[in-house]
Amino acid sequence: MALPSEQMAPDPQGRIHTFCSALEPGQPGQAGWYQMGATLSAGMALRWLRDSVLGWTQPDAYDAMTALAAQAAPGSQGLLFLPYLVGERTPHMDPAARGAFWGLTLRHGQAELVRAVLEGVTFACYDAFAVLESLGGAPAEIILAGGGARSLLWQQIVADVFGRPVRPLQTSEQSALGAILLAGAGVGLFDLATTAQAWASYGEVVAPDASRRGLYAERLAAFRELYRRNKSHPS
């Protein structure tokens, strides 16, 4: 989770990272800083499920996984996933945090496993967002980038959990494009902020489903409690 800011505003508790942006800090109306909440196992958690649990090797495995997850009901029939496979940074700063599936029963199948991972990663990202929000950041919408932005199901889960519209960034090879923008602006070919906005390409906005707000609020509370309980039982 990254949030642009005109002011340098580090978190006194050290739960987020504060960086200079590529824009010059201190200029009025210009986001010269950004704050970042780091979730260590986001796409990595889905890859772990693909490789180590499902064992799927087909090129379209991720598409097949999210299509399968769409068959499961929101909330994954009570199944929760903690995505702390390599510890966690924001908000816990806990290298000893560990992942878990909790609530498994005979009624759960592959669809619930995949959806629980998507939901668990989203809960972890929301925890990072909540820290940014507590420090004064309150964006009206979420811009989703990366591989997860290609999944309509994951877009909807993010919108529902965050309670905000989601705009997926469809610009391909985002890192390479960023390097081009920085290089071009660095040699004076164009204005960085103006060109970055002009070159960005977005998909359709996904609105949150208000009927799921209560469900996901309950699941988020259970997710947070599971971390607290799991923390008292180190591996």
What are these regions (language model features)?
Residues 1-235:
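Active-site core segments that coordinate phosphate-bearing ligands/cofactors
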